[in-house]
A protein has these predicted regions:
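Short glycine/threonine-rich turn/loop motifs
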Residues: 1-36, 98-206, 211-219, 254-261
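Post-cleavage N-terminal segment of exported redox proteins
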Residues: 45-124, 139-144, 225-261
Length: 261
């Protein structure tokens, strides 16, 4: 059995992604992202020609392509555009956090403390005022910044995946990966680009006390290496509880995404 080296990224709210696709940004457009896994030997290990042949043999798909494009000539471009449009329709915006923002529900005391930790910057001078500084990378309404960053998983000598550098050939992009959205993060283990952490608690521990220095490490994370984030056991529990408020249960049960036919 072939073993991949990267964890699959979530596919929702893609319309707000303006800085290429995949962990390393090798796909410029979402329609490009749609067809690359088909041909990847570690994923579907198929050929586009074979996929087109299968689709063309299905009357259901021929009818669908005729309805959309005016004829039943199934091509790679049409297939990619159709998948792109479907993925653009997948949106998640009704988590408990969103309901709290709208004023229709309340966060628990633990969730609220976690939110404040999430949004408060690291403060090396006043520990009691320091937060987890999560919003530095995972800010905004989609809880990501659409950038490629090195989050301190490994030291230079231990990089098993060069990440964005494989695309740009820029050494400063070494081990930098796309910052993912934290929406629905409770339901998408394992975590990090290589799936090395099984739980959110492990992820929090990494940022609190497990950062490895390297040449391309994000400066904000670099600043925390000597002291860590000062998070207590209770802080960690609160932070994870807040992250779980980002789960959108209506999105998870929306049949438009699980059974579009």
């Amino acid at each position: 059995m072939l073993q991949g080296k990267r964890q699959a990224m979530s596919v929702f709210n893609m319309a707000w992604n303006s800085n290429k696709f995949f962990w390393d940004g090798r796909a410029h457009l979402l329609r490009d992202q749609a067809i690359l896994p088909i041909q990847d030997e570690l994923e579907m290990d198929e050929t586009l020609e074979n996929v087109l042949s299968k689709l063309s043999a299905s009357q259901m798909y021929k009818d669908q392509f005729t309805r959309v494009y005016g004829d039943d000539d199934i091509t790679v471009d049409k297939m990619a555009l159709a998948m792109e449009q479907f993925m653009l329709s997948i949106v998640s915006y009704d988590s408990k956090y969103d309901q709290w923002v709208a004023g229709t529900t309340e966060l628990t005391a633990s969730e609220e403390r976690g939110r404040l930790l999430f949004e408060t910057e690291y403060n090396p001078f006043f520990q009691e005022l320091s937060g987890a500084d999560c919003a530095h990378c995972h800010g905004g309404s989609n809880f990501e910044n659409d950038l490629y960053m090195n989050n301190g998983l490994d030291a230079d000598a231990d990089f098993a995946d060069l990440g964005r550098e494989n695309v740009t050939n820029d050494p400063m992009d070494r081990a930098r990966f796309k910052v993912p959205s934290l929406r629905n993060i409770e339901l998408t283990p394992p975590y990090m680009h290589d799936g090395r952490f099984s739980t959110l608690e492990e992820v929090v521990d990494h940022y609190n006390e497990g950062i490895h220095p390297s040449t391309s490490l994000d400066p904000a994370i670099q600043a925390t290496i000597e002291t860590g984030l000062f998070l207590t056991s209770d802080d960690k529990v609160d932070l994870v509880n807040f992250l779980k408020t980002l789960t959108d249960h209506s999105f998870l049960t929306d049949t438009r995404y699980s059974d579009p036919f």
